[in-house]
Structures are given as C-alpha cells and as structure tokens.
C-alpha cells in the first residue's frame, strides 16, 4: 500500500483538527507562612476581599488582607497540617451558606453543615454571608408586635417586628434565658427563629437545644453554632451566616427573629484576627472598623415593604411585608455600659433591655432595670390592650425606686408616700416571672389590669404571685371566650374593660389564693 504525500498531509491535518486541547486557567498561589490560623499567600494575583481560597484537603480560607505582594487569609478550620510552599487556589466566590426551610429544626455550624447527627440537609438554595442591607425606600415602619411573653418587656419595653433590641448586662444576669424564652414564645406565632451561639461552651449550647426541643420550639428554629473551641474565623462569621438564613424568610414575606449570643465574643474574635493580620489597633486594642463590624450586621434586620418582597420573589409573593427582628446580646464587665463595644451597639440598635446584677441577686427575675431600658420604636407596635393598660407601670416603678432611696433615711412618711411605696413594691413583685413560662397577651393584660386598678392594695406582698396564679387559673376556667378573644385580637374597649373588671371582682369575692 502506497500513500502519496498529499494523503499524508491531509491525514495529519485531520488529526490536528480533531485533537481536543483542554486548557484550564487557575488563579494559584503559594503559602509563604502559617501562624495562629493566619496564612500569607504569594502569587494570588486576582483575588477579592472576602473571597474563599481553596486549600489542600477541601478546606477553605477567607482572604481578608490584600497587600501589594501577598494576601493575608484566615483559615476556616484546623490549620496544623498546612505547610510553607503548599499550593492554594482562588475560587472567585464569596462565602455562601445553605438557606431555606430545610434548616428549621437543625443545629448547624457556621458553614451551614449539620452537627446534630440527624443526617444531611437537602437545602435547595445558598446565600452569600455578606449582603448589603435593604435601602431606605425598601423599608417600612415597625408596627406589628413580637410578644416575648415577659410582662416587664411587653409592657414597658415592647419589641416590634423588624426592630433591633439589645439585651445587655453582666455575666449571669439572665440574658440568654430572656432570648430563649422569646424564641419559645414564637412557637405558635408564625415567626421563625434563628439562634446564633458565638464562643459559648458546647455544654451550654447543648442545654439550650434541649430546652427548645422540650418546649416544642426547635421545629421552627435554626441553631447556628460557633463554640469556644472553633477557630476565631468561624466565630467572627457565625452572625453573618445566621443573618443570611434569617433573610431568606424576610425576603419572602415571612417574619423571623434572630438572637446573636453574644456579639462581645464576636468582637473579641474579630480583634484576634485583626491583630494577627497586623492591622493597627485602636481603643481597647479593637481595630478601627469594629463599629462597621456590628452596624453592617444589625442593619440587615429590618421590616421590608410589599414592593420589595414582590420584586425579590419575581411576583410570586404579593401584598406581604417581611421582617427580621434582631436581639443582639452584649456582656458588660462590672456593669460598664460605657465601654467601646457596648456603646457602639447601643447606638446602632433601636433600644436596649438592661439587666442588672443587683436586681438579679435580689430575686427580681427577669432583672430588667426600667430606668435605663428603652424601646425607641416598639411603642407603635405594642398590642393595643397592653399599651392602654400598662401606661402607669414604668412610672410606678420609677417613682418607687426614687422613694425607696429616701425611705431608708426617714421613718415618718405621709400616707400618700406610703401608698406609693406599697404599690411600687407590689408591681415589682408582680413583674417577677419564672424561666420557660412565657405569658399570653390575655394573662399579661389581666395581671396589669389588677395592678393598675388597685386590686393588689389589700394583698400581702408575699401573696402577690399566688394571687396572680389563682386569678389567671380562674379566668382561664370561667372566662375562656374573653381570653381567646384578647389573645387573638389584642383589642381594648369599654366592653372588654367591663368584662375584666367583673372577672377580677368575681375572683376577689371568692378569696381563694
């Protein structure tokens, strides 16, 4: 068989044309140094701030410092086996976490991976952890309540859907207990909850999850965990990951509540990362952008209007507003609310609930200090009946605190002052509440009605809580229809007032407490 030169050249051309050349361009760099969870990378030319960098073994680092000839990145996870000279790759992606209803009832880590042993999570969507907050035009004013189930909070410091209300106090003053009770109270309210645990002991978090499960609230809750044993990077990112999960509900016309427990530990984790990245320290060694750290997180909690929801869902959801309510927690040192991080978060949020060690130790639990606790926007969101009845509660407590200080130095008090002191003591006693026992709107309204209309004046101080328990039990038995109506509508009119008066008079006549 003979081949001439033309056939040979045609054959070669065919082979060349059919040859499949596959080339892959990868943005690759080399690790120059590894120390304390921070890696320096040389050669990553095209990398974004906050980009995920793929490391050997399927782990990732987060690019935070972009310098002229190197990139400073923080490793998300263990770093002991990383060595100088290893190759790393830029992914071109910002960190994303899984979001959606599939996460409800689950315990996940910062990256959205399940850690509760209940199998994988089949989430259909992911969302970037860093998202720009809704603009002014997309927002709507707060006018719907979030019932915490606490008499002292719902009457004096009401919280609305889309509000940011800070819970602040020293260690062991009941901050987490208050937030967990607020989550438990949402189990039948249609509000989804996200609990973000930052830098806490694993045993404490396990206890919280168990309590949520016991009270039937875990099925509507996502628990995001960055425990004390996790790296600083994961503790710093956990609130943003939890917020992205909450925004899924907000942007689809649902209501969600997120608890950050606590942002002091997140600020400490961020300070650690910043100092290791050699960023210049400022006040209390925090970096210059620690205010922005919290403001960009808390601004994402908002009430968005129906147009925003409709636009976001491409017209699938119409006529529904969405909200994300935030309860950030800050731990103070020896009651110092004027420290750097507490003052920052106080100025960002729409009010604060201040829990005091002295009150807690005196048995007033929840230990809410009504003097410096405020809610800047919750008043317009308060349930109508609670708003009408609770007007005098804060005044009575403030007057009582002031008079109690003078009463220590004086024995001969006039009748009016004695009456005021007596009333203040009774109201203080009445504001006490057990943990894991959130109260309905009707129960709160009836209790406050009894206090405000003078029904407690002849009750001994030690019997006030017994009187309240017996009154509520009697009301639920004899006036079930009234209770159901108030729980459903929260309305208040002359007819309801007359019924509440008759109920309390009838009960007092029984003398059974």
UniProtKB/Swiss-Prot annotation:
Its main location: membrane. Its EC number is 7.1.2.2. GO terms for molecular function: ADP binding; ATP binding; proton-transporting ATP synthase activity, rotational mechanism. The keyword Transferase does not apply. It is an enzyme of class 7 (translocase). It catalyses: ATP + H2O + 4 H(+)(in) = ADP + phosphate + 5 H(+)(out). It is found in: Cell inner membrane. It is a peripheral membrane protein. It comes from the Bacteria. The keyword Transport applies. PROSITE patterns: ATPASE_ALPHA_BETA (PS00152). The record marks 373 as: Required for activity. Keywords: ATP synthesis, ATP-binding, Cell inner membrane, Cell membrane, CF(1), Hydrogen ion transport, Ion transport, Membrane, Nucleotide-binding, Translocase, Transport. One of its GO terms (cellular component) is plasma membrane. ATP binds at residues 169-176. HAMAP family: ATP_synth_alpha_bact. Produces ATP from ADP in the presence of a proton gradient across the membrane. The alpha chain is a regulatory subunit. PANTHER family: ATP SYNTHASE SUBUNIT ALPHA, MITOCHONDRIAL (PTHR48082:SF2). Belongs to the ATPase alpha/beta chains family. F-type ATPases have 2 components, CF(1) - the catalytic core - and CF(0) - the membrane proton channel. CF(1) has five subunits: alpha(3), beta(3), gamma(1), delta(1), epsilon(1). CF(0) has three main subunits: a(1), b(2) and c(9-12). The alpha and beta chains form an alternating ring which encloses part of the gamma chain. CF(1) is attached to CF(0) by a central stalk formed by the gamma and epsilon chains, while a peripheral stalk is formed by the delta and b chains. This is ATP synthase subunit alpha. The lineage of its organism: Bacteria, Pseudomonadati, Pseudomonadota, Gammaproteobacteria, Vibrionales.
